[in-house]
A protein has these predicted regions:
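N-terminal glycine-/serine-/threonine-rich beta1-alpha1-beta2 phosphate-ribose binding loop
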Residues: 2-139, 144, 150-163
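Non-transmembrane alpha-helical segments in soluble domains
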Residues: 11, 84, 103-106, 115, ...
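C-terminal helical cap and adjacent loop that interface with cofactors, partners, or active-site loops
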Residues: 14-17, 55-57, 246-270, 292-294, ...
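Tryptophan-centric aromatic hotspots in well-structured domains and transmembrane helices
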Residues: 30, 80, 120-122, 129, ...
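NAD(P)-dependent dehydrogenases' Rossmann-like dinucleotide-binding region
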Residues: 48, 186-204, 216-230, 273-282, ...
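Secondary-structure transition/capping motifs at alpha-helix termini
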Residues: 64, 130, 155-161, 184-188, ...
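A contiguous active-site-proximal alpha/beta segment in oxidoreductase catalytic domains
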Residues: 136, 143-219
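Rossmann-like dinucleotide-binding domain that binds NAD(P)(H)
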Residues: 218-301
Length: 389
């Protein structure tokens, strides 16, 4: 952590950031939302620049002319140095700065917005602190708990900053088309949805090990309960298998395909009415999340949704046929090929037009052109369904 900042002191500030008074405090500028820099480019600070933070988010924002990356932050020195070099190479200069502590990004007055690509246990706390600092927020999915989703939703509403969840599926043609067909009745009355998500990984327990040079483990843990450093749990994506940091494959992959399902049945701001299920939880292992699972959801309109481990597919079944994508982003199949050819008049179409990528949607939102398509309410509703499962 930054010099002089003890873990206990940091946790006190973290609790304060998520407390009720924080929800009603205006942003520092006193405006309804954060200001945009005079250059007319949205200036960005990146928090978390691991594999997804650079390979997906940083790479995408560097290609948007209206965005400008000013700083990168990561608790791993090698990652932030690599990301800084990536930014400087893209812009042909050496202007990008880097830091270990994300609060240095929030304190930088020339940064309009932050892009958060950290483990899940940091998502909401960083988003809340950024919003209260007057920064617009692009943050990866999901939340860690149901309560966090409520805090996120209320904080963004109170501060007036723009928020975009980092989920791309609503701008992926395959999943947008599935939702469009189902919402417009191409399958008749919807009866059942089948979703298959990856199984959880099982990692054995490890002995405590020396913290590697150039890695701030205390800041990586942040608001999570203290535990000694072991290599695997801090590895890229491997932390997803520990409940202190994530909800496992269910909340990782479910954030994609379960969102498509909820959109298809008009429940993006709703949720299930009944939930039942079972899972297999490893014993005497580092992994604490379910390695195998099967969950039964009931939604309004007598729609059953079954989510189980074992793949990456989604299938809708209705009174007039079925529609599926058998694996991640695979082409659609249907019981009748004519289902795939259905056309809906614009004035009658019950599905919104396909939006730009989540990155462009965020920039458009900050510039006041549109409301970003994945709001705090969306991520709260989706995450709630996953957490309850």
């Amino acid at each position: 952590m930054s010099p002089g900042i003890k873990r206990r002191e940091f946790l006190k500030s973290a609790v304060a950031a998520l407390s009720l008074p924080a929800l009603v405090a205006p942003i520092a500028s006193g405006q309804e939302g954060a200001a945009v820099s005079p250059s007319n480019r949205i200036t960005l600070g990146f928090i978390g620049v691991g594999g997804h933070g650079t390979g997906w988010n940083l790479d995408a924002f560097l290609k948007i002319p209206e965005a400008r990356v000013l700083a990168v932050c990561d608790v791993y020195r090698d990652r932030r140095e690599k990301a800084r070099a990536m930014v400087d190479s893209a812009y042909g200069n050496s202007d990008c700065t880097d830091c270990t502590d994300f609060r240095d990004i929030l304190a930088q007055p020339d940064i309009d917005a932050v892009v958060i690509s950290t483990p899940d246990h940091w998502h909401v706390l960083m988003s809340v602190m950024a919003a209260r600092a007057g920064k617009h927020v692009f943050c990866e999915k999901p939340t860690l708990t149901v309560e966090e989703g409520q805090v996120l939703r209320d904080t963004i509403a109170r501060t007036g900053v723009v928020y975009q969840g980092g989920i791309e599926d609503r701008s992926v043609e395959i999943y947008h088309r599935m939702a469009e067909l189902v919402r417009n009745g191409a399958l008749g009355k919807l009866n059942r949805i089948l979703i298959v998500l990856p199984e959880g990984e099982v990692f054995p327990k490890e002995d405590e090990a020396p913290i590697p040079e150039g890695f701030d483990y205390d800041l990586w843990l942040g608001p999570a309960p203290y535990s000694p450093y072991t290599p695997t749990k801090t590895g890229q994506q491997e932390w997803r298998n520990v409940f202190d940091y994530s909800g496992g494959k269910l909340t990782d992959w479910g954030a994609h395909l379960m969102d498509t399902a909820q959109v298809a049945m008009f429940q993006e701001h709703g949720g299930p009415t009944e939930i039942d299920g079972q899972g297999t939880f490893p014993e005497n292992a580092m992994t604490t999340t379910a390695s195998e699972y099967k969950i039964y959801y009931q939604y309004p309109g007598a729609v059953e949704m079954i989510v189980k481990s074992g793949g990456t597919g989604i299938r809708f079944e209705g009174t007039d046929g079925w529609l599926e994508s058998p694996a991640w982003r695979k082409p659609l199949n249907a019981s009748n090929p004519e289902i795939l050819e259905a056309v809906f008049a614009p004035e009658e179409n019950k599905m919104w037009p396909i939006p730009p990528t989540e990155h462009q949607s965020f920039i458009d939102g900050v510039k006041g052109r549109v409301t970003p398509y994945y709001t705090p309410e969306d991520i709260h509703r989706l995450s709630t369904a996953m957490h309850l499962g």
